[in-house]
Amino acid sequence: MDRKEMDTMRKAQLVFLLLWMPLMAHAEHLFEAGLQVGMADYRAQCTYVSPVPSLHAGVQLSYSYHSSRVVGMRAGATIDRHQAGFGKNGYTDTYKTIDIENEPIQIDYTIGRLREMYTTWSVGIPLQLALTGKQVAFYIGPKVVFPLQCTWTENADNAALSVYFPKQDNRVYESFPLAASRSFKEVRNGTHNVQKIQWWLAAELCYDIPVYTAQHSKSYLSVGIYADFSLSRETDPVADRSSLMMLSDTRDGFPLHRELTSVVTALRQEERLVSSRNLFDVGLKLSYRIAPYNPLKKNAKECKCYFW
């Protein structure tokens, strides 16, 4: 390499450093560890049952790069546990109809509360735009989620038999001998598969409280709220599953053998169908952030450029 080429390279380095060093004058690197606790729920079109919210919990490790005091980027990894489902209170269905003295009598089974809950463990990778102020920060951006383990739980509380007299519009639970009533609770568990990759929109608003400030580093305790919404619609993952339980009773010499329909099976019936659903989380977040010392800040402020 001759002298002319070396001079050209040094000039290019000078131009690059003159543009880059002022930009680094306010650059900051943040390392964060956080805990999220809140509510998970489904957004779905359904009239027969109601969504049942439950717990969402997650941990997050992330790295943020702020090229200025206003704009930055954040990337990281999260481990989340979501639980939500659907439920129906006062579930009633007909077992059979019999005639006694030319009067139809309807034998039903009733369930005080019928629920189906889905629990998902997942790993997420968020990539968010950071808008920061003096002590307030707002993050928003996409999040790629990889489900790891998905389970479901069906349970029925306070299930019993009853007899309904249509002409009198009267329902009897205990006194009629043919409806040997029995109250019980039953639970069934299983696993299912969901989409391998899901896209979410993640947002967070937080307030930073300085904890430690020194010449070479800073640390903050961050308190805020978060809201994550799934952009990937989930379809029914257990379309061929059998029913929830078997109800049988032989008291008073009247045998009864009936499969109780699960919530998901009921949802597939005509207008009761929930063809797809979206999961969302909302809650509080507590995190600890560390901003290590950046020696380039001092060099940028003093415009010290070094060449070789």
Task: Please name every model-derived segment.
Residues M1-E28, A291-W308:
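Cleavable N-terminal export/targeting peptides
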Residues H26-H66, S287-Y293, Y306-W308:
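Short glycine/proline- and aromatic-enriched beta-strand/turn motifs that initiate or cap beta-hairpins
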Residues A27-E28, H66-M73, L131-Q135, P210-V223, ...:
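Short loop/turn motifs that connect adjacent beta-strands in outer-membrane beta-barrel proteins
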Residues H29-L35, V71-A77, W121-I125, V136-F146, ...:
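Transmembrane beta-strands of outer-membrane beta-barrel proteins
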Residues L35-R43, Y65, I79-Q83, T119, ...:
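Transmembrane beta-strands of outer-membrane beta-barrel pores
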Residues D41-S54, H82-T120, P147-Q198, R233-D281:
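Extracellular/periplasm-exposed beta-strand and loop segments of Gram-negative cell-envelope proteins
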Residues Q60-S64, P126-T132, C206-P210, K285-R289:
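Transmembrane beta-barrel domains of outer membrane proteins
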Residues I140-V145, C206-P210, F307-W308:
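Exposed, low-structure sequence patches enriched in small/polar residues
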